Amino acid sequence: MGSKVAGKKKTQNDNKLDNENGSQQRENINTKTLLKGNLKISNYKYLEVIQLEHAVTKLVESYNKIIELSPNLVAYNEAVNNQDRVPVQILPSLSRYQLKLAAELKTLHDLKKDAILTEITDYENEFDTEQKQPILQEISKADMEKLEKLEQVKREKREKIDVNVYENLNEKEDEEEDEGEDSYDPTKAGDIVKATKWPPKLPEIQDLAIRARVFIHKSTIKDKVYLSGSEMINAHNERLEFLGDSILNSVMTLIIYNKFPDYSEGQLSTLRMNLVSNEQIKQWSIMYNFHEKLKTNFDLKDENSNFQNGKLKLYADVFEAYIGGLMEDDPRNNLPKIRKWLRKLAKPVIEEATRNQVALEKTDKLDMNAKRQLYSLIGYASLRLHYVTVKKPTAVDPNSIVECRVGDGTVLGTGVGRNIKIAGIRAAENALRDKKMLDFYAKQRAAIPRSESVLKDPSQKNKKRKFSDTS
């Protein structure tokens, strides 16, 4: 207990360590190497990081392995302070305690000091991603200064970064940040929409660890048996996908609910299905190149794989995970951005669906009295004006087709609608537009005796009403 209290006092005494060395740490950019045009921290490599996390979990029997693989604390801080230049596969590991503990043990080894192993069992509880000071007590401010001098010698031997290239990269990043959230990336959209500015600019996830987790599939984590259950669950994108799926459905529901106040529940469900189907979400995912960033332990391009046979659902999943990542990153500020972004993506899908799908057609301009009007103009008993259902709606084709006919089989008008009632009304409306036909049958009705022209309107089966010849 006394050791722990002393440790906390030591930490308080070293609170100024980061402030005093902040400028020096920011100068550590010269320890990076220029790899394929991108700046990357050279002290950590992905495979070694995986081994390091395992070694820390099994520290007692793996201490020697940690000393062999781990960079020291200065190198670790360089990676933490420059996460935007760290390979994305490594970012989740920087949010866990194991790498920092390994770096501190390596620091003690470099400084020829004995490790305080009694502190190791409590290390995970003390670990905080926001805390930059060493947790192990034996690493003092003087030790860090000495280590800085050793690192300076190493830095002088490394290849220096082309300053002009680095500045150009910074300028490019600044230009991108200056673009407003309403701006667009003028990339091609394929068959989704033909527009000059498409797709809408992607809202950015600021937290690099969350952004990296969006593109990590569960298959890359399942063999990491050294991770605890909680660490494993939070190392891949399934939880983010779960959150993003709910957000996507809710936002799309609100968009169409407010946009179409006259739509029935069935119509709203049909339209929402167009917006949140795996096929549509997959198209959006590919449009933003999410499929190229997805990390799995199987070949996504294998044409015979179960993945391909599953219609590329993983691509839709990563899009939902990105939405979830935005919410986890900054729910208060990002939710309005998500709504605005999804509204832009939804617009061409909604326009196409409402234009081409009969089930989504509006009926506010439908003349509900069209059948009565048609009978009043040309109807009489022997004409036998009636409506025949030519096609009923099915799951494959929701269209209904109804024909307005007379007794001899002549078709006066044809109507199409999402149900038989609407299709019948449209058939009557179609017949009413044919003025030549109406004139022909009106003259026929006028030529017959009045007693034969009295008829019962078949469309009013429950009403005892007669239409007399008024011509």
Swiss-Prot record:
UniProt region (Disordered), positions on chain: 1-29, 168-189, 451-471
RNase III domain location: 227-331
Keyword terms of this UniProt record: Endonuclease, Hydrolase, Nuclease, RNA-binding
Miscellaneous field: Present with 4970 molecules/cell in log phase SD medium.
Entry's Gene Ontology BP terms: box C/D sno(s)RNA processing; box H/ACA sno(s)RNA processing; chromatin organization; regulation of fungal-type cell wall organization; rRNA processing; rRNA transcription; termination of RNA polymerase II transcription; termination of RNA polymerase II transcription, exosome-dependent
Composition bias type Acidic residues, residue spans: 172-184
Upper taxonomic lineage: Eukaryota, Fungi, Dikarya, Ascomycota, Saccharomycotina
Keyword RNA-binding on entry: yes
Protein name, as recorded: Ribonuclease 3
Biased composition (Polar residues): 20-29
Physiological role: DsRNA-specific nuclease that cleaves eukaryotic pre-ribosomal RNA at the U3 snoRNP-dependent A0 site in the 5'-external transcribed spacer (ETS) and in the 3'-ETS. In vitro, cleaves synthetic 5'-ETS RNA A0 site in the absence of snoRNA or other factors. Has an essential growth function in addition to pre-rRNA processing.
InterPro entries named among the record's database cross-references: dsRBD_dom, RNase_3_N, RNase_III_dom, RNase_III_sf, Rnt1/Pac1_DSRM_fungi
Recorded catalytic activity of this chain's protein: Endonucleolytic cleavage to 5'-phosphomonoester
Species in which this protein is naturally found: Saccharomyces cerevisiae (strain ATCC 204508 / S288c)
Annotated gene: RNT1
GO molecular function: double-stranded RNA binding; ribonuclease III activity
